[in-house]
Curated annotation (Swiss-Prot):
Cellular component terms (Gene Ontology): plasma membrane
Annotated gene: tagH
Name of this protein: Teichoic acids export ATP-binding protein TagH
Family: Belongs to the ABC transporter superfamily. Teichoic acids exporter (TC 3.A.1.104.1) family.
Origin organism lineage: Bacteria, Bacillati, Bacillota, Bacilli, Lactobacillales
Record's compositionally biased regions (Polar residues): 449-466
Protein location: Cell membrane
Catalytic activity: ATP + H2O + teichoic acidSide 1 = ADP + phosphate + teichoic acidSide 2
Region (Unknown): 250-466
Source organism of this protein record: Lactococcus lactis subsp. lactis (strain IL1403)
Length: 466
């Protein structure tokens, strides 16, 4: 009997996932708030898993694709939570999967520093281990290249090198070395044996039966979420290989039918079936365990669903958003809509905001008022020019049609004569009986009959005045 300390213990472990009918944002949102339960199907990835792993043991996990191997390793490493059952972990856990946790845009050296900081190593410890990690990884000059340029084997080497230099109590290797070359695998195997001799626990998930045989003390065979066998490699591996050979010999249709039947069993699984299995396995503890399972399910909160309080907050935020949108389409303020909601919906909703229009009109009026003096000055200048033009036009018209002139303010007989190209005597001759010693604005006087030279002189004079 093995008296070593138990490092990992799982009892009646299950993991249930909710399957949506179609992958869409609408279905995800409904599932989040819990309104899509009718369309969801329960898929039990793990069903009633129980086992123990002790100090210094290396345990392999084998099975076909979709058997639940990665789900089990993720639960043990704490990345996801189980649905029912208990998982007891005694020690620090480190997991390595092909490229797991790697930041593709960072270099290999930067990834070493990042992962070391995440597990709590100090800068001094990282610096002291950096060269050893790089040397063990065999990446050479590629250590300073971005990880996105690495092959899957190079990523596995880097991840494994980081893990073994963290010195954890429990190491989980999920297909981390299946893509590595034989030289590196042999070196890793030697390192793993050193850890095992130091009393460290190793959980190895792999499809490589050669590695499982060489590394592992015991093997767990998972078959579509159930433990098919758990024991020594020489006992379990032949049974598994026999099953694989049987499966491969089946016609394609029979293989698909087998997979469909097994997956349907995972869909049809229920808590009642779990309780029945517990009773058959251990009648003495059945009542206590059944109560524990029932309590766990009552208290279990699905990680991807919102709690009742969170749902209330989401609905309140949604209502607030809709209300604010309606207020923006009305002529009421937010405070007015809250004080008088009935009036808001019956009289104010979808009405233009007259207050804003009035405010805009007032602003425009102020702008117009402030600019009006400039406009008035401009208009006055324009009026003066028009008046002057009208005067000249009037004078010209008067000269050409009636040979008369209306005296303007500031005019004198000599100025009138000079502007129109006449002499004072010529004007006096056509205005007998008029006393030109005193003339006043508005007075009408006759001008001599225009001649060609006079007209030319008059036009030049008018142009100069303008």
């Amino acid at each position: 009997m093995n008296t070593n300390k138990v490092k990992i213990k799982a009892e009646y472990l299950t993991k249930k996932f909710e399957l949506l009918p179609a992958k869409s944002s609408k279905n995800k949102a409904k599932s989040l708030i819990g309104s899509n339960s009718k369309n969801e199907k329960d898929f039990w990835a793990l069903r009633n898993i129980s086992f123990e792993i002790r100090d210094g043991e290396c345990v392999g996990v084998i099975g076909l694709n979709g058997a639940g191997k990665s789900t089990l390793s993720n639960i043990i490493s704490g990345q996801i939570a189980q649905t029912t059952g208990r998982v007891e972990i005694n020690g620090d856990v480190s997991i390595i999967a092909a490229s797991a946790g790697m930041q593709n845009n960072l270099s290999g050296r930067e990834n070493i520093r990042l992962k070391a900081l995440m597990v709590g190593l100090t800068n001094k410890e990282i610096k002291s281990k950096m060269d050893d990690i790089i040397e063990f990884s065999e990446l050479g000059p590629f250590i300073d290249q971005p990880v996105k340029t690495y092959s899957s084997g190079m990523k596995a080497k880097l991840g494994f090198s980081i893990m073994v230099h963290q010195n954890p109590d429990i190491m989980i290797i999920d297909e981390g070395l299946s893509v590595g070359d034989k030289t590196f695998v042999d070196k890793s195997q030697k390192k793993m044996f050193e850890f095992r001799d130091e009393g460290k626990t190793i959980l190895l998930v792999s499809h490589d039966m050669r590695t499982i045989k060489e590394w592992c003390d015991r093997v767990i065979w998972l078959n579509y979420g159930e433990v098919k066998a758990y024991g020594r490699p020489e006992e379990v591996i032949p049974e598994y290989e026999k099953f694989v050979q049987w499966f491969k010999k089946l016609p394609k249709k029979e293989q698909e039918k087998f997979k469909t039947d097994q997956r349907q069993a995972q869909l049809d699984y229920s808590v009642e079936e779990l309780k029945a299995e517990i009773v058959s396995q251990n009648p003495s503890k059945s009542r206590r365990v059944q109560r524990e399972v029932t309590e766990e399910l009552k208290n279990k909160k699905d990680n991807h669903k919102l709690s009742l309080m969170s749902k209330v907050i989401v609905w309140l935020c949604l209502l607030a958003f809709i209300w604010i949108t309606l207020v923006s389409l009305s002529n009421a303020t937010l405070a007015e809509s809250l004080r008088h909601p009935k009036t808001f919906f019956t009289e104010r909703l979808f009405k233009s905001d007259t207050r804003n229009m009035t405010s805009t009109t007032k602003k425009e009026a102020v702008v117009k008022t402030s600019s009006s003096p400039k406009k008035k000055v401009s208009q006055a200048k324009k009026t003066t020019k028009v008046s002057s033009t009208q005067k000249n036009t009037s004078s010209s018209s008067s000269t050409s049609n009636q040979n008369t002139y209306i005296v303007q303010a500031g005019d004198s007989l000599s100025i009138i004569a000079e502007n129109h190209g006449y002499s004072v005597e010529e004007i006096q001759q056509v205005n007998p009986g008029v006393d030109f010693s005193v003339i006043h604005p508005g007075q009408e006087i006759n001008l001599p009959e225009p001649t060609t030279s006079a007209n030319s002189t008059t036009e030049q004079s008018d142009g100069a005045n303008q």
